[in-house]
Amino acid sequence: MDILNLEQGFGAAECCSQAMAAARQAWFDSYYAASVLRLPYTIVRKLVRGVFAEYGASGELLRAIPERAALELALIGGESYLKPVFDGEWHWRVIPRSGILVFARDHAGEPTDVGLAEMRQEGRHFYTLLERRQVQNGLLTVSNRLFRSLSENELGREVPLSACAAFAGLPERFTYSKSLGGVGLVRLATPMTNCIDGSGEGVSVFAPAMELMRVLEENEAQLETEFRNGMSRLVVSRDMLRGGQLKDELFVALDESPENVGITVFSPELRQKSFIERQQAYLRLVENVIGLKRGLLGEVEAAPRTATEITSSEGEFLTTLLELRRCFETAAERALALVAALGGPAERADISWGDNII
């Protein structure tokens, strides 16, 4: 029987609610949407730059972590995952929340049963490896299954792992002899409380502002239409126009005396509002909704500020650069501990943030 989707292939369903699944899809869609404002992209990029402005790390394992990609994907989808890979040397694969199925979590929100998929093409066939990671009695068991189809949009039929050279050396099932403290992945999650369904799953940094950003996008689209209409019209006396020679989408003729009309550019008040000024105002609105430190996104200042000044304790705000840095430090420490548990070198997380100018 042909298998159509990942949940059918794994024989399990994600443990998140429908509201959470829909919200997560909306976060990624809004981030990658080619809209005028690109507010989600702006928010994430400003935060990532602020967090890692003068980031420094010692040790090969720590420096190998793609820190910006990991945090960026966590800010978009609420959480991302680091998977250690050893191919002669240790490196890390960053997995977005949209690239992993979570079938079960513990009381702290940490996954205890997940599914990963990897696709390869050989000739006209598409091979999809389904990797399931389950914690049972404190030990991690990894199961591998391979599917082959003629379309990348479905899994197709199950085949032996040896059918694809890229996966031929993998075991069908393997259980680690000692605990890895989880599913063998490092979870990097945003520090905000889940505002979608109250569960332990991480939420996007801009999740509380999704409706506001939708309204702002609609408002900007309307202003852009009015701007184009206003910019493209010249009011002139009708006797100055020669029929059939000028486009009436540019000129508007009035039946008044030429001395009273002349040539007048239609310039509504909205043209006096620059796009940059509106965008800064929008970012300040978003700041207030998602609880960012005031001025972190939308304030234009003449004097530079240090990271310490931006993340000072004044004001009651939920998310600051310091909180995001603590989240990354925790994930980095867990990443090093995971490599050591897998038999790799033991390193200490030595991270420097500097006192950078933002």
Predicted segments with their positions:
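Extended, helix-rich architectural segments
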Residues: 1-101, 107-109
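Extended, regular secondary-structure scaffolds
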Residues: 81-195
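Extended, charged amphipathic alpha-helical segments
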Residues: 164-312, 352-358
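Non-catalytic, well-ordered alpha-helical scaffold segments
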Residues: 280-284, 326-329, 333
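Glycine-rich and small/hydrophobic secondary-structure elements
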Residues: 314-327
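Extended amphipathic alpha-helical segments with heptad-repeat/coiled-coil character used for oligomerization
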Residues: 330, 343-358
